[in-house]
Amino acid sequence: MSAHAAPSPEALSRRAEFKAAKTEMLERFRRAANVASLMHALSKLTDEALKRVWDDCGLPATLALVAVGGYGRGELAPYSDVDILVLLPDAHDPALDARIERFIGMAWDLGLEIGSSVRTVAQCIEEASQDVTVQTSLLEARRIVGSTALFERFTVHYHEALDARAFFTAKVLEMRQRHAKFQDTPYSLEPNVKESPGGLRDLQTILWIARAAGFGSSWRELDTRGLITDREARELRRNEGFLKTLRARLHVIAGRRQDMLVFDLQTQAAESFGYEPTQAKRASEQLMRRYYWAAKAVTQLATILIQNIEAQLFPATSGITRVLSPDRFVEKQGMLEIVDDGVFERHPDAILEAFLLYETTRGVKGLSARTLRALYNSREIMNNTWRRDPQNRDTFMRILQQPEGITHAFRLMNQTSVLGRYLLNFRRIVGQMQHDLYHVYTVDQHILMVLRNIRRFAVAEHAHEYPFCSQLIGNFERPWVLYVAALFHDIAKGRGGDHSTLGMADARRFCREHGIASDDAALIVWLVQHHLTMSQVAQKQDTSDPEVIKRFAEVVGNERYLTALYLLTVADIRGTSPKVWNTWKGKLLEDLYRITLAVLGGANPDAHSELKSRQEQALALLRLETVPDDAHRTLWDQLDVGFFLRHDAADIAWQTRVLYRHVNAETAIVRARPSPIGDALQVLVYVKDRPDLFAGICAYFDRNGLSVLDARVSTTRHGYALDNFIVTQTERDVRYRDIANLVEQQLASRLTETAPLPEPSKGRLSRLSRTFPITPRVDLRADERGQYYILSVSANDRPGLLYSIARVLAEHRIGVHAARINTLGERVEDIFLLAGAGLSDNRLQIQLETELLRAIAV
């Protein structure tokens, strides 16, 4: 609101009149969705309203009221700022200041978000020379009312001072900096329709640059000048129209300026475009795919246009650097360029050859505008005949099999849509978002991220990131089979049905068509089928159980398959979201790999031999720490076989050293240390067992912001609980060594209390989880041996969730034997091994499942 006195009745009447007219326009837009008409009508409505206020303020005819920025362009979105310039003559009466201030205040009273400046012509030119943002807004200045002569003088002086080359350089730099803020990708979960790469601002930037250079101010004019083709002009207009419509609809839905396509509005925005949910895809996912395709096209065409404008503003001082392929390609200033516009039409096989040359030629850093345009206009050439051409299939395999440059080549193939033209099923998942609370990338971006992760394992400069993976891939023959598996592992997402099974068929067809040897083809197809198997076994099953390992080893079959699956699994999890991977998951997978490898090598996965081996290793470690030879017996005699199978030798030794003097302790023993795997805290609890113990410990962790990754619960023969937890702090940059003592003292004190368990705190869900909640699921079943019951819980992640589950179990006096907490982005899939009287009773099972569903509901 303005800083002046309260609006007069007349001002309030005008405001109501303006609002009613605007509301009618927005209603027409809701019905007809003609965004150009809406923006023009809003601009005209605003013009007329400001003219009336200008006249009422009695401002002299020597001044001019000028619309600048988007308003000057005549493109007002429903709740955009209205940027105006009050243009003053060089000599003016200072007494005008009060009237100008009154004018601006009355403009605010209309309900407009006014952005105003008051300057002389000279001040405008000076400000523009210092600030490219001011220079840009003035580029589209339009007189609303006032002195025509003054405005024309401003226009002449402005264009005389405008340096097209300097403006180009500044705007391109500004665009790069803006893109960097959005991680240089249009594929954001919540893109900014205006500012993100491929958004409206990119289109505006091109037109600003072209206008400043005198090349035109519309796509039609750029087409006439030869900077773009008719087809490109149509594509630009079509995508610009979609983005403007989407932005306007966001404003209307939100009832305010809203340029971010946030989760909360994606479903409503999708419905406003007529999208409806299907069995395979949400309405929001369909809208986001349309948006990503538009942003991708804008990015591609913007690259072509900017290079073309640059070539005209900065004529090259040197021509061809070298010939790369006679009659096809040359290198020109570090860019791969076709020798003429008809290369791809004469030689369709040159399309894929371009990417092979880009990948293998040192010094080539990209494709020239001419090459990009030719690719863009070669879509009809990339047909079934082209896909089936043996030479093209050979070139595609050569691209996959190069020692370096693969990731960059495939990203460029995707950006130019060539990859989707060659692999039609890949085209189906380009821009497909997965609102599963797990993946934060579109399916095509996730696939390329997995490919990139596998490639990094093989690159020496990145060997320090995942040394074990780098070691394995260094000895893995024909690693390109992993790249093919990466390309196909999620290619069938969104089709309905099991994507692993559907993807197998696609992979099998690809291998057959590309002449891949039968043993390599079998591995590729198997990897696509089983790409989720290893993570499910490691994160959801009891890998201390020899039977689990034996079954997994039977599925894998041999070392090459195991290594391939391990490398693909690590790359896949790391490619879902920056938040999903952690060292604990890495440890689970590596342990499963090593144990399975031993079994494949002939080791017998029976409990007795494993028990003996771990005990011997633990005793050796205890001797190194000068623990008396037989001191361990007081504790070990009270432990069952399960304890020794659930913990490795180092863990057994640590717990023994802590507890051998306190086997019959009257008070709780709590010890904490930074987890040996890093990025976590290991907490040991030893105390007389009771039904609510697990829940009480979880309550403490919940209240103190500690998330449980893993829980291993044991009960001694003389009634003590020996529980181990791996926890992480929700705050970043925590030093676990610093909080270990605090956890020991506080948790030990908490365990002495006899107060009833507190009510769980239902922590607030993230916006993503609130917008795309998953249906909570609870499944309770007996294990294969009938010894325990397995409880599986799937729900939206939130603070307090684990404690809510534990409290229900405690109320029914059900003991938790083990817990595997699996957090997948915004979703949890937890597994509990339960023991308790009455669990075989169907009525108790139904009651338990009902109460758990109520406890985990959002």
Swiss-Prot record:
Gene3D superfamilies: 3.30.70.260, Beta Polymerase, domain 2, Hypothetical protein af1432, Nucleotidyltransferases domain 2. One of its GO terms (molecular function) is phosphoric diester hydrolase activity. It comes from the Bacteria. Residues 443-565 form the HD domain. Disulfide bonds: none annotated. SMART domains: HDc. Its cofactor is Mg(2+). It catalyses: [protein-PII]-L-tyrosine + UTP = [protein-PII]-uridylyl-L-tyrosine + diphosphate; [protein-PII]-uridylyl-L-tyrosine + H2O = [protein-PII]-L-tyrosine + UMP + H(+). The keyword Signal does not apply. Residues 325-681 are annotated as: Uridylyl-removing. Uridylyltransferase (UTase) activity is inhibited by glutamine, while glutamine activates uridylyl-removing (UR) activity. The keyword Magnesium applies. Its EC number is 2.7.7.59, 3.1.4.-. Signal peptide: none annotated. Residues 1-324 are annotated as: Uridylyltransferase. InterPro entries: ACT-like_dom_sf (IPR045865), ACT_dom (IPR002912), HD/PDEase_dom (IPR003607), HD_domain (IPR006674), NT_sf (IPR043519), PII_UdlTrfase/GS_AdlTrfase (IPR013546), Polymerase_NTP_transf_dom (IPR002934), UTase/UR (IPR010043). Belongs to the GlnD family. Modifies, by uridylylation and deuridylylation, the PII regulatory proteins (GlnB and homologs), in response to the nitrogen status of the cell that GlnD senses through the glutamine level. Under low glutamine levels, catalyzes the conversion of the PII proteins and UTP to PII-UMP and PPi, while under higher glutamine levels, GlnD hydrolyzes PII-UMP to PII and UMP (deuridylylation). Thus, controls uridylylation state and activity of the PII proteins, and plays an important role in the regulation of nitrogen fixation and metabolism. Has four distinct domains: an N-terminal nucleotidyltransferase (NT) domain responsible for UTase activity, a central HD domain that encodes UR activity, and two C-terminal ACT domains that seem to have a role in glutamine sensing. This is Bifunctional uridylyltransferase/uridylyl-removing enzyme. It comes from Burkholderia lata (strain ATCC 17760 / DSM 23089 / LMG 22485 / NCIMB 9086 / R18194 / 383). The gene is glnD.
